[in-house]
């Protein structure tokens, strides 16, 4: 299981869709066919909101890279989520949405199941996991696990243990977003100590990731390097980092635990959550630890 932690209202879903779900859904076999299926169980975003995020991610990462799949040849078209919510779409955005909806309708046919569950019930979730795993849904997205009261701490602990057990018994790949504890808000360095009842989740997670916004002034005080394959070495990219443009934000991704690779890494991304788009800038060092033990 992969655990992805961030504070409330900090675009957890908007990041996870293009970073994790889209690559799975776009994975092709040797014949170029897509088979991977995803079961989504959510308690905050309903299906309409989620599919809007999915559509914008497809526009950013599929439409703009494979234009021959669509009815026009113009590069780098985007649609603003704000324009969708406020019913202010331009003619170009309307055309783009029509194209991507047709593409998604065919591309995701019988490959995505969405279940909205306002209050997570471990027994009910287990029932859905078992039901859909028999239908080939081996990838699961749980959005969002959170604990704000003592009773919810116990629920999250039980849910974590159930997800670990069922995933191992049925060979499932599970990604679960986790809301970080409010009393840790303001921390610069994020890790498992930012989660209420952290032990129950971190013990079962194969990978633990944490995510927060970072101001350009803070970035200037850090070292940022990126591996240059042409030179076969890391090079400094701090001087190339620009001030964020309209609707853009810089985000830090903390790799706290990784049983399959390097951990204790911090990656800097430039993101636009209005268009559901991001790009990696480099690896960060020089950030002092300011948390618990």
What do these predicted regions represent?
Residues 1-142, 147-177, 183-185:
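Glycine-rich nucleotide-phosphate-binding loops and adjacent flexible coil segments
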Residues 31-34, 60, 64-78, 83, ...:
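C-terminal regions of RecA-like/P-loop NTPase motor modules
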């Amino acid at each position: 299981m992969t655990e992805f932690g961030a504070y409330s209202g900090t675009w957890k879903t908007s990041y996870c869709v293009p970073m994790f779900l889209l690559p799975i859904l776009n994975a092709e076999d040797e014949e170029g066919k897509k088979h991977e299926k995803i079961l989504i169980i959510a308690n905050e975003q309903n299906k309409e909101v989620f599919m809007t995020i999915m559509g914008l991610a497809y526009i950013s990462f599929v439409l703009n890279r494979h234009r021959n799949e669509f009815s026009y040849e113009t590069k780098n078209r985007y649609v603003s989520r704000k324009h969708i919510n406020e019913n202010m779409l331009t003619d170009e955005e309307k055309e783009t949405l029509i194209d991507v909806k047709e593409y998604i309708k065919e591309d995701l046919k019988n490959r995505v199941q969405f279940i909205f569950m306002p209050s997570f019930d471990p027994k009910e979730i287990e029932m859905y996991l078992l039901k859909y795993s028999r239908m080939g849904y081996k990838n699961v997205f749980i959005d969002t696990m959170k604990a704000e009261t003592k009773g919810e701490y116990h629920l999250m602990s039980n849910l974590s243990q159930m997800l670990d057990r069922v995933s191992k018994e049925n060979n499932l790949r599970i990604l679960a977003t986790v809301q970080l504890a409010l009393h840790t808000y303001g921390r610069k360095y994020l890790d498992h100590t930012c989660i209420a009842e952290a032990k129950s989740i971190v013990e079962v997670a194969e990978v633990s990731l944490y995510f927060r916004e970072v101001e350009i002034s803070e970035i200037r005080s850090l070292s940022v390097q990126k591996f240059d394959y042409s030179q076969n070495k890391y090079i400094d990219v701090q001087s190339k980092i620009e001030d964020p443009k309209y609707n853009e934000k810089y985000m830090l991704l903390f790799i706290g635990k990784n049983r399959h690779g390097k951990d204790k890494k911090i990656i800097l991304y430039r993101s636009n959550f209005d268009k559901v788009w991001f790009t990696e800038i480099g690896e960060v060092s020089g950030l002092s630890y300011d948390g618990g033990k």
